Each structure stands twice: as structure tokens, then as C-alpha cells.
């Protein structure tokens, strides 16, 4: 290192808007800065071929370019593969990838999911675990079929079958890879390390056979059955949907709510007022339900004279809706209404069936249809207290029918009335509207009811209603259908127990959204009457109807008399490009038959259905390995998962399907397993435990990602204009309104991930996701928010390294003097350097930043182990703030010290170098690109002695002995004093460079005063004041007012709140505050007795007295004397001049060691005095050899704020 280095010029600081009374000196002068290399200069200039260990980096890095370089470096050196190889024998941390569907373009919401999935495996790998990250692709089901249908211009099942099932299936298979390149590019560019080469694919034969095995297991145990139930039905697609799928499609709609009159058969002048929100179901009405315990009123309609029957509690409500009087003439019980017959709203079925009766099991006869029945679900929350029942279109309605059927003898039971076909259109059963889609029939039906005098009232009813989750415009209907179901209700309690052991983030998901869904569990509607999906592996005897399940294609081929495989063979011969995985799909698998084991001569034929694609994805814990047919060791090792994460909509999707399948197959532990199947012999844990939870132990439930954009009103007949940033909207013509909402493909109200990466980089996006808020909160994608991540974190960290490298280059700091380093450059190994001193021997600020580093390490590890990336990032941000805004800033003079061999200077370099190395490791999981860039720079002097990548390093371990809590607390208070002092200046509009006479620091107690007084010089410099005083009594400088916290105090004191407010306002605020601080409460004497108010009951407000400016922190109040003397003003002008000269040094591309000469032209007497009075300070701060007041010959003129600046750059050769 050089024996001597020059004094460094201080970096210019950003000027404040106000001049604080001193005026902007650059508006009052003409300034010439002349760059020279005087022969007598004691400085030196670093040459271009210097052998320094470090090089100053680019001042304004382009992070996207740096990231592309890092990606190439990772590829070149197989860094991901190396990271796995280094943990080959380490304990496992298991991550499951929730499989996306690659037949749609990825958007920023997918970036959030993949970033969260990446950060924890990276962290756990650095913490010593082996984390295999197997990618996956969800390739079956409605998402794929709908997209292919759109491409082909077809929608219904009839159109698909007319097109041809075989070519349709082949198109589905090829379409799932349509955007594969975009997904792979996104994954790579975001820095998501995952094994794409060996990804599991749900249509692959090995995966399908694993699913078949699980279904055979359920079938053999009697858990998979065929039943006639009311299901949520997608009429346009011709298939039932599961509860999880239905849950993803709800949205708010307005439907007609009708009050319809059902005249009683035996009292035609009296009508039941029956309520429904689905008028289209009225032609299939079978019953009207009442609650036996309710009181019902018979009222007279003042307009029509009719007698109406409805719940007594709802008479006033209905009268209000009708806007006329309803007079109560009698009250009756609900029980008395049960059994009464009525005229149905539409008579088609009555005409055809002629109002039949049936023989009761208990004897006697009763009408099969159109009578009042009892039901506990009837309420008076809304409607009329009488509910229309159409059992074909409601699960609860259907349960009533099931109960009613048990009352009648066989052969005389009521049949289900259903006037709607599977296509959602009316059939011959309701001929007047045959072929009309039910949701389009409501208006016609209500008009018919009005014309017949049956419609009493019509209004719009706002409620949530399900639509197909993959066809947004298609509303679902409840519909009777024979489907295959899994008896998940049998496992409800076990699923709840399993769920109770899972570590959910946020925790309320466990007993809230997810727990509630489990509580209301219904049997899983598994089968789909569709085409592209895992075929249901059940073959049925064509003679006896008996069935068996098949668990693999190999088992199927081994069946006696197998036939039909030639259909696949012929297809493959005709098109050799067809993947072999298609042979286990429709239509090829449908052709495979074999001899029935149940009756000689009969054949076994597969049922026609495929299964819910959510079952596919939920089976991935074992199906990704093709287990149990292969890879037993991998499955045992990789089950259950330690961590999964997806968005909140997956509580009814992938989270549920995994938990349900795993609970049913693998149970609670070996002790409760049923014998006879391989699944029930499996211990579902990798360690000694064999209990819940499985198949995942921890789950982060991500919030929804919303978009923020700017939208024009749009001219008539023209589409709206959508812009994605405020600056674009400001520059565009017309008025734009800021909008926030869901990401929309049609609106294109978000940037593509590739645009974001090219513009800001992946690290900026990742840090925004991790550090902006907890990931389970809804997050808004906005350009500005991601852009802000750059200066707030990435650039601040880069500038800290830049500061280090600039001065390390100047001074020749070379860490390779440490000759016994390990590959991770641990602090312990750096201690072998001759100039390295133990932390305990270094200065207080060195010990402080090391203490902060190790406190941060402990916090980050604690939070990341709890899957809390947000608070981990807050700790990192706080450390970086302390490093850059306090340690580096307060240590600059140490780096600028002229004695290059000073132990204190060496300490500063070693401290900053150590902390930067450790911080680079800490940030590696969060911002992997910047981390590796910094690692390459910081470790370059060591060459191959250091690991190639930071991602091969261990995560730093906190050392409790390095933590000095007392020092941390004291320095935190000192930093708060500096921060509050700057806030007080800003509030008083006093420039930072304007010195002030005094600062008063008011403390809550005197325990820290001695330590603070030993740092007076630091406080004076930080706050630019001449004197500092500390006190615990600030009455001379500030006054306090105490006001009620109305939200908290209102319920506590009630009507006395005005009295309390008046008493607090008239009391001495300073005395009340003292009482609050000493006693913990404030006591007031009310007429009713004493009232104690704690800190939550009141608010303390601060006001500085005349001549002072104040700001309050958590541990102090800082009060500045705002009186500015002429002497202080002149010093402030001199410091303004220094800032101006520093700016011009930058404009002239001065090196940090370059000496200059300065000339100032001004007629301002005060400024001239300031220059003469502070000449030494000005020259010392700016490395000026000369400072002249005079003319400026041959100078270049530069425009500045309110004045002119003349600059000449010459060389003194």
C-alpha cells in the first residue's frame, strides 16, 4: 500500500429547496473550477494498468445487463448443479412444485409465485440441506380443452365429437407445450432454480398409471362409487365440476328474485307466498317448504283483496316492497301448513301426471307432488318464509325428495321432475320453452307469471354465483347426474386433524378459509364427461354390470382375451410422431376390452369418463415419481414436502386435492392402516415420525396480484387507451384515470415479465415481492413500485460496494494478505492477514456494525425458518441502512486518512470488507443476481481460492458473542437523535448546510446521557450545530397537549367524553406527560369519581416553543435553536460553495485524488467575507490548491439555477 494518501474531497450532497435565510450561493456567483496536476501535489493518480486488487465499478450499473451476465456464468459453470452436488449427502429439504399449465402466457402474478418458490429452497440449500427441485406441468382438463376449443372455433361436446375425439385429443396434447419456451424463459430469467429437464408431466403414462393405482386403491376399499346426485354442472361443456373447481369461479351477479303465489287447493281464495331467486326452476317445482316452528300470518292484500300466507316476521318487509298495506287477519303455525296441497306455478307436469297420489309406508295415501313439506333450513332472514323446492336443481331440495320417497311404498314413490336437459335448455317436458337456455328464460317466465296473476313481486337480488372456472361467461347450474364420487366425507375429521398440524402462513388459513372448506366437505365429484384427462380406470362387465379397477397398462395387457390395442397401434403407425403416452388416453384406451372374470363369455369395457384434473395435480407427491410402479426410494425420501406455496385460490384447488388424497391413501400412521394394499403399508414420513402432517408440512398462501394502470375514457366507438405508468399518462393526450384491479388479458393492463426484466431486472422485481409486504397480502403490480426497489435497495448496496472498491483501489487494500483463507472467505480465516485485528480491539463503530450484522443474521434465520420472508427482508434493509447511511458515512474520514498504514484505517477496510462479504451471502436467496455479481467482485483478488459463486456458500451463522446489545441500543438512540434533528430542520425549512447554535435533546431518563455526551462531536457534526445539551425536562423548549383517543376512550367513558376532552385541554400537558411516564396513567377527577387513562386512551401532541423546531422519536425529542446569526449564515454560505465546487468536480470527471484551482467572481460582500473567513475549510474539503476571488478569462459558461457558472479545465504542465 502507498505510504501516504491525500485528503479525499467529500461527496456533494443534494441541495434542499429552501435556503434557510442564507440564499443559494450558486445564484450569487460566477465560479471557475480549473483542474490541475501541480508539481508540488502530494497526491497520486491511479494508472490504468494498476495492479490494485479492486477496481471501481460502474457508477450507474444497468442491472438487467449484469443479470444476463450472471445467467451466462451460471450456465457456463453449472452453478445450480454444483449447489446440489455439494449437498449430496446432506439432510433433505423437500419442495413440491405446484404444476402450472403451459398453454397460456405467463404474467407477473406467476413471477410472484415462482419467486417465493425459489427463495426458500435457495436459503435452505445455503443452510446445509439438499433440495431437489423437480418442475412439473399440469396438462389435462378443462383449461386445455377450452383453449383448444377456442382455437378450433368450437364449444359444445356435440361440436367436439363432430370434429373427432381423436384429432381433438391430439391437438390438446400438442397445445400444452404452446408457451413452453416462454415459461422456461421466465423461469430462467427470474432466477428460479428448478429441474426443468426432468419435470413431471401429468399426461405421461408413468404419471397416469400412478393415478390409476391410487384410484384402484380407493375403489377396492369402497371409497370410489357411482351415484346419482345433484352436482354443479357446466352445461356448455357437458360435465360436472368438483367443489374446488366451483369455488374458483364465483362472482357477484344480479338475478331476479320473485315472490310467486301458490293458491291452496282446498282454499283457492288463499295463496302461499313462495320465494325463489331462480325462476327458471319453477316449471320443475315439486314442493313448497315451511319451518314447522315458525309463526305464519294470513294477510289481506289491500289492493287485490286476496289472502296471502307468509312468515309473520316478514309481513312488514313484504308490505314495504309492495308499497301497500297487508292486514293480518289470522296467524297459524308452520306445522298446520304441512301437507296442504297447492296449484303449481306452471301446470305442464300437473296436466301430464294428473296430480297422482301414492300409498304411504304408514298407511293411507298422499299426493306425491305440489304440497307443503317441513324443512329446518327455512329462515326469516330474507324472502317470505316459504321456499320453492325443485329437487332437480338443488342439493338441499334433493335431500327433501329423498326423505319424501322413504315415506312411500316401492313403486309409488315420487319421481324427480326435471324439465331441463344436460345442455341447460328446456326439453319437451316444458314444451312452450323447448330449446331455450335456462338463464335466458327468466324474463319470459316472469312475464308469464305476471299475466297469469301469479307474480306478486319482482326485484333484483345481488349475490355470488359460480361460473365455470375456465369459461368465464358460462354460469353453472345445479343438475341431477349420475357421476363417480370419492367418499371424502368419511375422512373429514382426519383431514381436519391433518390440517391442524400444517404450518400455514398466514396462520388464519388453517382454521379459516381452508379449515372451513374442510368442515363443509362433500364427497368429491371425480368424473368428467369430457375427453382430455386421465381416464377413469374402471372396467365394467357388459353382462353383469360388475366392475373392477386397473392400476397399470401392463396389468391391462395381461388380462385374458385382451383386445383393442390395435387401435393405438394403427394410430401410431399412421403418425409415428404421436407420443406413446397417448395410448393410455381416450379414445385409444376406450377400445381396450378383455374377458370378464364375472361371467364366462362376457367382455369388460371401460367406463367412458375421465377424472377431475385437480385429482391429477393432487396426486403429484407420488405420481411425479411414477410410484408405486417405480422409484420407491425417491418417493420415500421426498415425502412429505417441507414447503409448498401457491396463491390463495388453491385452498380449494391444489392444497385441498393433495391433502385429501394423501389423507385417504396414507392415513394418520402405521397403527391405523388397513391391510392389503401397498399404500397402507407406507410410513409417510422421512424421519422417525409417522404421523401428520402430510403431504406437506408448511405452506405459504400467496395473496392475489392486482394491477395498477392508467385508462382513458375512450372516444365513442373506439377502445379505451391503457397506459402502464404515471409518466406515460402525463405525457399522453387526454385525461387518464388511475385504476386498480385484476390482471386482464383483454385490457393488457400489465407489462409482460420479459418487459419488466428488460427494463428493471429480475432482482428489482424479486425484492419488491419479498420486502414490500407479507406475501399473503394482495399485492399491486405497479411500474413505480418495482422501479423504487432499485434506489431503495439494489443501488444503495451497489453504492456501498462502489465506495469500498474506489478507496480500496486508491489505497491498494488487498485482502489476499490473509494467506490461510477458506473457500467461503469466512471472517475467521481472514484473521490470518497481518493487518487484521480482532473485532474487540477495533473502534466502537466497527464493533457496532459487527453487532448489527450478527443481530441481523439471527433475525433473518429465525424469520426464514418460520417462512416469513417479509420480516427477514426488513431486517436486511435495516442492516443495509445502518451500513450505508451510518457506518460508511461516519467512517469516511478513516478511509480518507493520509496515513495508509494506520491500524484504524486497516480496521475500517477489514470491517467493511467482512460485512460486505457476509451481507452478500445473506442476500443471495433474495436477489441472486446482484449477490453473485458482488461476490465475484469481492472475491476476485483470491481467484480460485474462493468459491466460484455465492450460491455455493453456506449461509452465515450468527455469533452471539459478537452482539453487544447495550452498544446497539445506544447507537440506535444516537442515530434517532440525528434523524429527528434532520426532521426538525426540514419542518423548519432550514438547510442542512446552515449551521445552528444549539440542539437540546430531551430524553425519557438520564441513563444514556453519559454515553451520549462522549459522542458530542458526532452529534454536532451530524446536526451541523455548535453545541449539544441533554435533559429529561423539556418544558423550556416544547409544550405538550394531551387529547383523547376517541376510538378507544369513547366506549370507556360514554357521554363523559366532552368533559374528559375539556379537562385534558385545560390541564398542563407537560405535567400530564410526566405523570403518564412515571405512573403509567393520567388520573382525572370526574363528578362520578376518579378516571385513570393509560397511554392507549390518550394521544400526546408536541409543539415547539418560539425560536425552536422539534421532532419526536420513540426514545427522544430533538429541539433545534432556529436563530441564525450572521456568523452562522456566512459559514452556511461557505458550505454551499463547497457543494457547488464538488458538483463541478463531478462534471469535470475529476478523480478522487485530483487537485484543483478555484476562481469565484462575485460582488456579494457577505459571500466574499464567507470565502475569506472559511478559505481553509473550502480548500481542504474540495482538494483546492488555490481559491481566488476575481475575473474568469477564457472560461466556459454553464447555466445554473438563477445564475451562471464559468468553468475551465486546463492542465498545468
Curated annotation (Swiss-Prot):
Motif 'HIGH' region — list its residue ranges: 100-110
UniProt cofactor(s): Zn(2+)
Query: Cellular location of this protein?
Result: Cytoplasm
Highest taxon above the source species: Bacteria
According to its UniProt record, this protein's enzyme class is ligase
Instruction: Provide the GO biological process annotations.
Output: isoleucyl-tRNA aminoacylation
Q: Which SUPFAM superfamilies match?
A: Anticodon-binding domain of a subclass of class I aminoacyl-tRNA synthetases, Nucleotidylyl transferase, ValRS/IleRS/LeuRS editing domain
Q: Its principal location?
A: cytoplasm
InterPro entries according to UniProt: aa-tRNA-synth_Ia, Anticodon_Ile_ABEc, Ile-tRNA-ligase, Ile-tRNA-ligase_type2, M/V/L/I-tRNA-synth_anticd-bd, Rossmann-like_a/b/a_fold, tRNAsynth_Ia_anticodon-bd, Val/Leu/Ile-tRNA-synth_edit
Q: Where does this protein hold ATP?
A: 745
Query: Which reaction is catalysed here?
Result: tRNA(Ile) + L-isoleucine + ATP = L-isoleucyl-tRNA(Ile) + AMP + diphosphate
**Where are the residues of the annotated region Disordered?**
1-24
Mind naming one GO cellular-component term on file for this protein? cytoplasm
Known EC number(s)? 6.1.1.5
Q: Where is this motif: 'KMSKS' region?
A: 742-746
Enumerate the UniProt keywords alphabetically: Aminoacyl-tRNA synthetase, ATP-binding, Cytoplasm, Ligase, Metal-binding, Nucleotide-binding, Protein biosynthesis, Zinc
A GO molecular-function annotation: tRNA binding
Instruction: Cite the domain annotation text.
Output: IleRS has two distinct active sites: one for aminoacylation and one for editing. The misactivated valine is translocated from the active site to the editing site, which sterically excludes the correctly activated isoleucine. The single editing site contains two valyl binding pockets, one specific for each substrate (Val-AMP or Val-tRNA(Ile)).
* UniProt family annotation: Belongs to the class-I aminoacyl-tRNA synthetase family. IleS type 2 subfamily.
User: Could you describe the subunit structure of this protein?
Assistant: Monomer.
The role this protein plays is: Catalyzes the attachment of isoleucine to tRNA(Ile). As IleRS can inadvertently accommodate and process structurally similar amino acids such as valine, to avoid such errors it has two additional distinct tRNA(Ile)-dependent editing activities. One activity is designated as 'pretransfer' editing and involves the hydrolysis of activated Val-AMP. The other activity is designated 'posttransfer' editing and involves deacylation of mischarged Val-tRNA(Ile).
**What protein name does the entry list?**
Isoleucine--tRNA ligase
Gene for this protein?
ileS
